[in-house]
Design a protein with these regions (language model features):
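Short beta-strand element(s) in the Bergerat
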Residues: 22-26, 124, 133-137, 210
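Conserved short strand/loop->alpha-helix "switch" segment adjacent to the catalytic nucleotide/phosphoryl-transfer site
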Residues: 42-66, 89-90, 172-177, 351-352
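Conserved ATP-binding N-box helix of the HATPase_c
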Residues: 53-122, 127-130, 183-193
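Conserved alpha-helical "signature site"
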Residues: 224-366, 372-380, 401-405, 415-426, ...
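Divalent-cation-assisted or electrostatically stabilized phosphate/pyrophosphate-binding catalytic cores
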Residues: 293, 382-415, 439-448, 465, ...
Length: 500
């Protein structure tokens, strides 16, 4: 069984990398958490921390996770035990009566009670997620805390400061009501050993689940280095990369004595760089210009001939590659999905005046700016990025790994958009599509949701994202209640694109 688990994890490592890169959750759900599942969960945690470059926290967090899984499973066992005994777990007298024999009876017949948990639909869910520069580890179960349980948790958290070591706790604390009753206190002490505190530990109720959350800082050195390198690269770039075959198409179109603007518009819609060029020159005339249609309306035929000519120093032609081809295809699909979702749902949503379907198409393309700029770095730029990373000595290889393959694209996209003087609302939207939503004005939330859904549809279709990783609240806004409905939406969008 161990070999099967390890093999499965080896296959899933790419999923873990993608989840971190796109700041998606990793979830594992179990009704009984058998031994092989515990091993699997611990291995996923180790790989997750490795990919977050926080491997030094492995031992401490593995211990904490084991304690919290036991607590969550015990909470579920307690519910079915009380129900079988005909006791009300929310009644203080019944609670006291039930807990007298709970530990002994369930320990002696645990498989029976675990099967009851399965039949009752009581689960334990582990959620791991990187959000910006913080790591979230959550244990969720669908047994809501009673008032007495909430009080006991509060008392334990308040008492932590009395103890300086686990030995001291083990020698002085014994709460027979909760078994050993040491789990929470020991978890906090373990967190303190790695420089954290009880402020990094939360217990609360959300969406009919009890949530225990540990919040960790990301690797500060790596995040600081990556942010500096993102600024440096963004400001080094003084030319817009355009895929060679796409440039040849539009270059031929603008060489015609009479410009076919519809054909030019379609060519621009196929390439991030071509769209950025149109916007660059349109912004010189109108600082609010976003959207290919709007940008083209501001540019004369002669200006288009110059913009897409060999003599324009703002252009850097790049050779196509499988990675770049996939990236451009992803951006095209995302843009098309965003365009159609906007048209389909705009009447139902409150939104900003600056938004329209053409703008959403452009934002769908521009959401891949960061990935495109990383992939099309010049040799000089790559060399300079490596030189910068080496200033961090022993961490430099990790920094380069995060810079080239991590979530750096979000930093670069945000910085480059500001540098290019993209309108603030557009910068907000492409910066907040999968994070930082609290910083977004409400009137732009519809556009962010559309962009998020469009990206996730494409990532799902590419088998990079799983359905469970998509925000349920956003799915619900669009009437998507299950995976079948989500697949149907994607199929309709793809069919529409093929027929366009």
């Amino acid at each position: 069984m161990m070999n099967e688990i390890e093999e499965r994890l080896e296959v899933d490592r790419e999923k873990i990398k993608n989840a971190i890169r796109l700041q998606m959750p990793i979830e594992i759900t179990s009704y009984t958490i058998p031994r092989n599942m515990e091993v699997y969960i611990q291995r996923v945690l180790e790989l997750f921390l490795d990919e977050c470059h926080q491997e030094h926290l492995r031992d401490a967090l593995s211990f904490c996770l084991g304690e919290l899984l036991t607590n969550a499973k015990k909470a579920n066992t307690k519910r079915v035990y009380f129900e079988e005994k005909g006791l009300d777990i929310n009644n203080p007298k019944d609670y006291e009566e039930g807990m007298k024999d709970f530990r002994d009876e369930t320990f002696d017949n645990i498989n029976y009670y675990l099967e009851m948990q399965r039949r009752a639909g009581l689960y334990v869910k582990i959620v791991l997620q990187l959000k910006e520069d913080k790591i979230f580890i959550e244990i969720r179960n669908n047994s809501l805390l009673t008032d007495s349980e909430k009080l006991r948790i509060k008392d334990k958290l308040d008492s932590v400061q009395q103890y300086k070591s686990m030995e001291e706790v083990l020698g002085t604390v014994l709460d027979q009501t909760e078994g050993a009753g040491l789990g929470i206190i020991i978890v906090i002490l373990m967190l303190q050993k790695v420089g954290l505190s009880k402020e990094n530990y939360q217990v609360f109720t959300e969406d009919e689940e009890t949530v225990t959350r540990i919040i960790l800082p990301g690797n500060g050195n790596i995040f600081a280095a990556v942010e500096i390198m993102s600024y440096e690269l963004s400001y080094m770039i003084d030319q817009i990369p355009v895929v060679k075959n796409h440039f040849e198409i539009i270059n031929a179109l603008v060489a015609s004595p009479t410009l076919e603007r519809q054909a030019i518009k379609q060519a621009i819609r196929e390439d991030i760089g071509l769209a950025l060029l149109a916007q660059k020159y349109a912004l010189e005339k109108d600082s609010s210009a976003v959207g290919i249609k709007k940008c083209l309306s501001l540019l004369s035929d002669d200006e288009l001939r110059y913009i897409y000519s060999d003599s324009n120093p703002s252009i850097r032609i790049v050779e196509n590659s499988p990675v770049l081809e996939n990236m451009v295809f992803h951006a095209q699909r995302t843009a098309y999905f965003a365009y159609n979702m906007f048209k389909n749902y705009q009447e139902e949503m409150n939104m900003a005046d600056e938004l329209n379907a053409d703008v959403m198409y452009a934002l769908g393309l521009f959401n891949s700016i960061g990935f495109a700029l990383i992939e099309t770095q010049t040799e000089e730029q790559r060399s300079y990025m490596e030189e910068l990373s080496q200033q961090y000595e022993e961490d430099w290889k990790k920094i380069m790994d995060v810079f080239n393959f991590g979530n750096t694209a979000n930093y670069i996209k945000r910085i480059y958009a500001k540098k290019s003087q993209m309108p603030a609302f557009a910068t907000y939207i492409i910066s907040c599509w999968n994070s930082r939503r609290g910083k977004l004005p409400e009137r732009f939330m519809f556009a962010v949701d559309v962009l998020y859904m469009s990206e996730m549809m494409q990532y799902y279709d590419e088998k990079i994202a799983d359905f469970y990783q998509i925000d349920r609240k956003i799915l619900k806004k669009y009437g998507i209640l299950d995976e079948k409905m989500f697949k149907t939406m994607i199929t309709k969008m793809k069919t529409s694109l093929d027929n366009d």
